[in-house]
Amino acid sequence: MKLPKPSEGGAMESAPAGTHIGVCYRFIDMGTQKTEFKGEIKHKRMITISWLLPDELMSDGRPFSVHKRYSWSMHEKSTLRKDLQDWRGKAFSMEDFEGPNAFNTKKLIGQPCMLSVTQDVRDGNTYSNVSSVGKLMKGVKPGALTEPTIYISLEKGEFDKDAFDMLR
């Protein structure tokens, strides 16, 4: 397959800035990725969480989606831990990390939340960024998921090839 010409790639619509209802529809374990921070190169396990914005539609009628990459770390200062605690509305305890009632990230799929979306313009392109994740307010009903849900874990015994094949 030939690569498209740069003018044929099409511009992506950016999700509008503001506070939105989001529904998690993808959790992707990306494995170990090469990252650079302050000039230092490291290899870190990364994940991506994706949300649909059911009340915000693109020009083709489909809902916008937004994504956030995280280091796979639950250290007290990690962004993943902060966002998950804000999303669920309570801090993690040791029981959430071990034992039969340990928190399973698969529970995130289909879960609604409040998202703060900001926009960043770089090189003439506008990018939408998830700046914060919060618990859905009482009484607020999220829209229905209109895209297939995908959960991919690279943990031993959890990889789902069919889910992987659904990525586009």
Regions found by a protein language model. Give the residues of each.
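Short beta-rich binding modules
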Residues: 1-168
